[in-house]
Amino acid sequence: MERQCSTKSQSWCVRTAEDEENNFMMICRKGNVYELMELAPFISVDGHLLHKYDHRGRQCIHMVALYDRKNAIMKIEILVNMGADINARERNTGNSLLHIAVKTKNYELAEWLCREPTVNLGAINYEHHTAYHMAYYLHDEKMKELLITNRAVCDNPEGIKMSEDDISDFSSDN
């Protein structure tokens, strides 16, 4: 499906729906905050890209949390204002943004998410693990304390079995 650019100044404008998706995901992953802000009026009108999953089962909001530690909070705020779901789950793992923050050891993002009133602090992924369970099995004392302090769901994971594969999945970029 061809798209036409309305002005020459819209250098991000692309020719096909696939190119559009790839460019948007790339800006979410590696672009700067200003590039994302420039897209806001266009994406907000037709928000399908905000909810589209890539081949790894991730939406744009997951890409930001995984790959742009420095600007994650600002970009996530912009995406949510455009209509992205702050509680969206990765399709393949069921991980939430809070799970991703634990996995990437992004303490600033984790604390910010815990303070956002609409974030589900008790989200459970497809392996039945909360973000706290991940921090527990990764032996990340700083993250565990952050989650406890900010009232995330921190039930005792002792009775929950976790294999070595599950633990390695936390630290790999599947």
UniProtKB/Swiss-Prot annotation:
Pfam families: Ank_2 (PF12796). Keywords: ANK repeat, Host-virus interaction, Inhibition of host NF-kappa-B by virus, Repeat. GO terms for molecular function: NF-kappaB binding. InterPro entries: Ankyrin_rpt, Ankyrin_rpt-contain_sf, NF-kappa-B_inhibitor. GO terms for biological process: cellular response to tumor necrosis factor; symbiont-mediated suppression of host NF-kappaB cascade. It comes from the Viruses. The keyword Ribosomal protein does not apply. ANK repeats lie at residues 56-88, 93-123. Belongs to the polydnaviridae I-Kappa-B-like protein family. Suppresses the host immune response through NF-kappa-B inactivation. Possesses ankyrin repeat domains required for NF-kappa-B binding but lacks the regulatory regions required for dissociation from NF-kappa-B and degradation. Therefore, prevents host NF-kappa-B release and subsequent activation. PANTHER family: NF-KAPPA-B INHIBITOR ALPHA (PTHR46680), NF-KAPPA-B INHIBITOR CACTUS (PTHR46680:SF3). This is I-Kappa-B like protein C1. The gene is C1.
